[in-house]
Design a protein with these regions (language model features):
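Active-site hotspot residues in diverse enzymes, especially metal/ion-binding acidic/histidine motifs
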Residues: 1-157
């Protein structure tokens, strides 16, 4: 699914331009300064209009991953969006955090990694170190490490 979105959005080189993807799919975007620290990102559908918002106080890498994660929910789980057509990751709550992620959350994380560090873009640069790849793709070193691990066979054959 992530590859399809990249092709449809005509994104061909790192760092993946998330604004280009949003624009290609008619999704508005805003960075919000007054989100609670516990809210990373959200997507809202208001009739035919769709808006994505991220917590502006987060690090650039976190904002990018959170937005890509929300896009994963939007593109993969849209029919079952809870909360009156709003999806919020890490919503404010007095409840303790769940010990494990739901399958939908895991899928959205995988989608985000595939969208931000696609194999086709990683392959030509894999000889670079993890810190350099992190800077190139504008993602955390953890996201790069996971991408390399997931694509180990394809990268080193």
């Amino acid at each position: 699914m992530a590859r399809k979105i990249l092709v449809e959005s005509k994104v061909k080189a790192p760092p993946v331009d998330l604004l280009q993807i949003l624009t290609a799919h008619g999704i508005g975007y805003e960075e919000v300064d007054d989100f609670p620290d516990t809210v990373d990102a959200l997507i809202v559908e208001d009739g035919p209009k769709v808006y994505a918002a991220v917590n502006a106080k987060q690090h650039l890498h976190r904002r990018r991953f959170s937005l890509a994660h929300e896009l994963g929910h939007y593109f993969m789980h849209r029919q079952g969006m809870p909360e009156e057509d709003i999806t919020i990751d890490n919503p404010p709550s007095d409840e303790p955090a769940a010990p494990t992620k739901s399958p939908a959350e895991t899928e959205a994380d995988i989608f985000a990694g595939e969208l931000l560090v696609p194999l086709e873009m990683l392959k030509p640069h894999v000889q670079k170190g993890i810190p350099e790849l992190s800077r190139l793709f504008l993602v955390s070193e953890q996201v790069i490490s996971i991408a390399i691990s997931r694509h180990m066979k394809a990268l080193y054959k």
